[in-house]
Amino acid sequence: MSQSTTLILLPQTAYQNPGNGAPYTVVGNAQPAAAYYLGNRDLQTVNLSVTNIIGNVIIQATLANPATVDNQWFDVYEFNGSDNPNATQYTNVTGNFVYMRAKVVDFQQGLVNYVKLSY
């Protein structure tokens, strides 16, 4: 299957010092995953690009439609910025998910250039 849909899970996001230098969390908007439009399709590709980041990018998914509370989301992939603070990479995520989103936790420095979802 060729990929024909690309959605932005998290647009360009720069660390904004909250005044005390403390890390914080950024949560992107939920986007329909492959199963939302394509029924039993279960392969999604996540592309991400970061520059000089300290923090973790977590990809989450849900089976709820719509997901109305945080405990309906579960982690399906985690990128550790401490291991590779300047990266552009992709990973395949398999699952019959309805929605997916990206979040950055312990965000202390740098730039998330993008996090994209394709299927």
Question: What is the meaning of each model-derived region?
Answer:
Residues S2-T5, L48, N71-F74, V112:
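N-terminal functional modules and adjacent low-complexity/disordered segments of proteins
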Residues Q16-G19, D70, A102:
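Generic cytosolic/nucleocytoplasmic N-terminal low-complexity/intrinsically disordered segments
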Residues A22-V26, T68, Y77-N84:
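Generic detector of short, locally flexible boundary/turn motifs and exposed helical patches
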Residues Q31-Q60, V98-V104:
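Beta-rich globular "head" domains
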